[in-house]
């Protein structure tokens, strides 16, 4: 793994670590009782370590001196230490699990809330696999900042100090051996933590890319099969997987070197202490029991330093994970409340686009000084070539994107003055690509209006001409439709989406090629249903079929972000212009009542 100056600078960047900890700290504070308990058990564990060494030394001296009365008195203490140790380990482990699991739960909910409140363009410009990776790889990698590791960052220095002071109490001369261990362990731990943090950052990034690859494979499985792309996608994933293996092996190698080196240092300290101690014992300056207690503790003296370096490396690894989700969590929104559904909706709303200018990237403008007025309760169809901006108008009207200049009005109120709840309650939308959620047909329909009665549900389904089909299924409205409605045809999904829009009962209706997936017979039936719900509602239609748009109040034609034609179908089809060009129809051959599909 190549390291550069930026990696080294980042490792010692206090602001970066403080920034990451500022995200975690409120969650730690929320569960302070659990961490207070962990601190109590931390101190208890240190006392048990020292008490065990004292017990071993005292028991050894009693045995050497033949003081069996003392031995008998010490045995109950041994069982007491075992019991306290058992309870400490059990409670400590359980409370740690409660704390870490609760914090991960809270963090996942906080992350999802932020994403659900995010502007649509931020979600659209981020790969779904990367977003999912935040909830899996990243959050599952923060243990180093919230779990046992965090407690050990406090415990291990205290344990080292306690052991060193106790060793100095037993033999000041021998305790100096431990002083030589400190600089070696600290330097080794710093290097280890630096290397592990950088490789961990690369692993998290690579895991995100692999999750994205898998997401694309499963979502585009039909295309992969149709175009014989199995080998290509498998090779891409295998290459990523091999890179991940290389990084994991690198981490394993570094850990092996570090822990093996730590054990070697501990063994050297043990042998030196044992040899020097034997000399001191032979001169009567130390008892055998004291030497045994010293050697036992000196062997553990390396553990806090060795462990501290490892825990610090884990902390750094967790910092890398928090860095990846920090940009999402730190965004401040005007409200943290989700939009709420409202039953009370006015029946008619006028729409206005006034001198509106919009660009997705700030360079290529989709609309420049665009103006359009739609009277309340009227219906219009938008026609234009691919890329003219038809769907962009829908995105702007729903508040998914904001214009760079100008304003969009509903009645006389600017969109910017409406809350998300107010705006979304005014609009029912049937997208070009129908999306149904995993669950039953009933659950998908009720998403539009949770307070829908059974009668209203059936009425909407009948209006969309989907009721009879639903009843023909073995479980009717309780039929599970699979992921994205995979068990249904395109037309069936489209009609469920239309029924869902009917149930929302909003004053503004947006139909983005809402009948594109229907056959001619079903389209005729749905067209009748749409004509019914379009009455007294302001409706905007994007369509490719003549039958869908010929009965609207007005058709507008846009090209390069400008309104270039408007009028009824009968007028526009006989006028030279883009509308007639897109229709590919000779006006002299078109009868007034023909129901012919045209490409618009």
Task: Identify the residue ranges that each predicted region occupies.
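An intracellular "coupling" helix at the cytosolic face of ABC transporter transmembrane type-1 domains
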Residues: 29-30, 120-121, 137-146, 150, ...
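Cytosolic ends of transmembrane helices, especially the final helix of ABC transmembrane type-1 domains
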Residues: 229, 253, 301-328
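Short intracellular "coupling" helices and adjacent cytoplasmic loop segments at the cytosolic face
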Residues: 2-14, 101, 109-133, 137-139, ...
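Transmembrane helices of ABC transporter permease
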Residues: 30, 34-45, 58, 76, ...
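Hydrophobic alpha-helical segments in the permease module
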Residues: 78-89, 182-189, 255-269, 288-310
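Cytoplasmic juxtamembrane "membrane-exit" helices immediately C-terminal to transmembrane segments
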Residues: 94-98, 102, 106, 169, ...
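Membrane-integrated ABC transporters
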Residues: 1-48, 64-77, 92-96, 100, ...
